[in-house]
UniProtKB/Swiss-Prot annotation:
The gene is AEN. It is found in: Nucleus; Nucleus, Nucleolus. GO terms for cellular component: nuclear membrane; nucleolus; nucleoplasm; nucleus. Exonuclease with activity against single- and double-stranded DNA and RNA. Mediates p53-induced apoptosis. When induced by p53 following DNA damage, digests double-stranded DNA to form single-stranded DNA and amplifies DNA damage signals, leading to enhancement of apoptosis. This is Apoptosis-enhancing nuclease. It comes from Homo sapiens. A motif (Nucleolar localization signal) lies at residues 27-35.
Length: 325
């Protein structure tokens, strides 16, 4: 009996059951890895371009020196162990960088901020955020928006803030602006003049070790006339150190101009400032309370408060004193 041939459909099933060629598998894996490597290299190049990743040394060149205040991984681990041991005792842990070294923030990790406020509440005495500007290390504007306060505006303080009713027509609600601004500030070194006022308006507390308040710029200089007052206004610092006039005219302050000026002042003393930070930082606990002693003083020096508010506050103080008597 002659055996019948298997149907073609059955014959076609055989090739599909064969094991794939090993070379094909390796080739596919190689292609997949090549794509991953290309994406990795593209990401690496982008980070290097943005300054978030240091460039590798060229072949044959000597390794780059360790930045001032920056410890190697071994040194960091060793100091961390010492800190943990010290934590079991009564004395607070203190780490000091090796002498002769310093570290400063990368330009991409440094921004300057300035806020303008309007008056809300009774007689417009409550300050609320109405405009916020953030500039980069090189002075490029990263954020500049008008912001609608949570309470009705009683006094626009246009002469000082530059804010008018028209600016509020397309203003961003405070809650929305706050999220946008904090996203830009977190993880950054923040520069500004009388920064506590800006953070208070934002209802935000930034780590003290990551703030650079330009009211302290005179401490790093020996310019005559800058130490006559406890705190010098941004306007005076700009004139004496940068030889530029700001906050002039009848249109009020410009938060972009003020933030840019603050960054210029910081860069003027950046080396000295970061050297001091490297010496005084690295204590446990790390952060100190923000200095709020300059709140009212700084606003008055920059002619922020309207005259009628100043008179009103004096009148209220007299009334309170009369009631006590």
């Amino acid at each position: 009996m002659v055996p019948r041939e298997a149907p073609e459909s059955a014959q076609c099933l055989c090739p599909s059951l064969t094991i794939p060629n090993a070379k094909d598998v390796l080739r596919k894996r190689h292609k997949r890895r090549s794509r991953q490597h290309q994406r990795f290299m593209a990401r690496k190049a982008l980070l290097q371009e943005q300054g978030l990743l240091s460039m590798p040394p060229e072949p044959g060149s000597s390794p780059l020196p360790t930045p001032f205040g920056a410890a190697t991984a071994t040194e960091a681990a060793s100091s961390g162990k010492q800190c943990l041991r010290a934590g079991s005792g009564s004395a607070p842990c203190s780490r000091r960088p090796a002498p002769g070294k310093a570290s400063g923030p990368l330009p991409s990790k440094c921004v300057a901020i300035d806020c303008e406020m309007v008056g809300t509440g009774p007689r417009g005495r409550v300050s609320e955020l109405a405009r916020c500007s953030i500039v980069s290390y090189h002075g490029n504007v990263l954020y500049d928006k008008y912001i609608r306060p949570e309470m009705p505006i009683a006094d626009y303080r246009t002469r000082w803030s530059g804010i008018t009713r028209q600016h509020m027509r397309k203003a961003v609600p405070f809650q929305v602006a706050q999220k946008e601004i904090l996203k830009l500030l977190k993880g950054k070194v923040v520069v500004g003049h009388a920064l506590h006022n800006d953070f208070q308006a934002l209802k935000y507390v930034h780590p003290r070790s990551q703030t650079r308040d330009t009211t302290y710029v005179p401490n790093f200089l020996s310019e005559p006339g800058l130490h006559t007052r406890a705190r010098v206004s941004l306007k005076d610092l700009a004139l004496q150190l940068l030889h530029k006039k700001i906050q002039v005219g009848q249109h009020g302050h410009s938060s972009v101009e003020d933030a840019t000026t603050a960054m210029e002042l910081y860069r003027l003393v950046e080396v000295q400032w970061e050297q001091q930070e490297a010496r005084s930082l690295w204590t446990c606990p790390e952060d100190r309370e923000p200095d709020s002693s300059t709140d009212m003083e700084q606003y008055m020096e920059d002619q922020y408060w309207p005259d009628d508010l100043a008179h009103g506050s004096r009148g209220g103080a007299r009334e309170a004193q009369d009631r006590r008597n």
